[in-house]
Regions:
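Bacterial Sec-dependent N-terminal signal peptides
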Residues: 1-23, 224
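Subset of outer-membrane beta-barrel
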Residues: 19-246
Length: 246
């Protein structure tokens, strides 16, 4: 059965922080991008394609394209793949990972444990700058590949789910040949949601995802969805809302 989803994202930039890792307001449809344990958690094969663009009227504005696929295999094994491409002005990052999960059957619920492996292709090309001269040694193109691994756990029951993951376990430098260079820092995700039946084939699906990066407040994604016959979803998401815990 085909499943259609509509999500209206309300972006509330109460505080502005540098965001190194793509954040997904549709994380329920890109779950194995941030949590490898989700690979194979659904009975059917899952393919997701999403695109996001900020400041659409500006040339070379930030944009993200994400693709994920996961499949339940034999012997409680799940496999998946995810590719995310981020473009921000002269910078391009492509994250490519393979996911593996194993299901522990706990009667009326399931616990999935997962690992992911892959890496980040990074490129910065100053030749697209209007001020580019071609002879300036400070305007050389940069490129690098940083391998990494990630891990996660996903618990699923008939009325709720809980997720914890660190999709990239190690900090990595954008360009290892430079003394001073930007770093991609470790991101931790904790989330959960519920399924609340209200009759007439309708189910309410509230969920919350928290993200933590060292040196920054916890950021949140609060989503409310209504599903009809488990085939059509509509909802609202409030994203990038900073949360500080003393």
């Amino acid at each position: 059965m085909k499943k259609y989803s509509l999500l209206i994202a309300l972006l509330l930039p109460l505080l502005i922080f540098g965001q190194q890792e793509s954040y997904y307001s549709l994380y329920r449809y890109n779950m194995n991008v941030i949590n490898p344990a989700y690979a194979g958690a659904e009975a059917a094969n899952m393919l997701s394609l999403t695109s996001r663009r900020q400041w659409a009227s500006m040339d070379d504005a930030p944009s993200t394209v994400a693709m994920s696929f996961s499949s339940a295999r034999e012997n409680n094994v799940g496999l998946g793949i995810s590719v995310v491409s981020d473009n921000v002005f002269i910078e391009q990052q492509t994250f490519a990972y393979v996911d593996f999960s194993y299901k522990l059957d706990m009667g009326e619920s399931q616990l999935y444990l997962g690992l992911k492996g892959g890496g980040n292709f990074y490129k910065a090309d100053p030749s697209s700058l209007s001020s580019y001269t071609g002879g300036d040694p400070t305007q050389v193109a940069l490129s690098s590949f940083n391998p990494n691994i990630g891990a996660g756990a996903y618990y699923s029951a008939s009325s709720f789910w809980v997720s914890f993951s660190i999709p990239r376990l190690f900090n990595s430098k954008r360009d290892g040949d430079l003394v001073v260079t930007a770093k991609d820092r470790v991101h931790s995700y904790v989330g959960g949601g519920a399924y609340i039946g209200i009759g007439n084939g309708l189910t309410v699906k509230p969920s919350l995802m928290l993200r933590k990066v060292k040196g920054l407040p916890i950021t949140t994604d609060l989503t409310g969805m209504v599903s009809w016959q488990n085939s059509f979803d509509v909802g609202v998401s409030v994203v990038n809302f900073p949360l500080t815990i003393a």
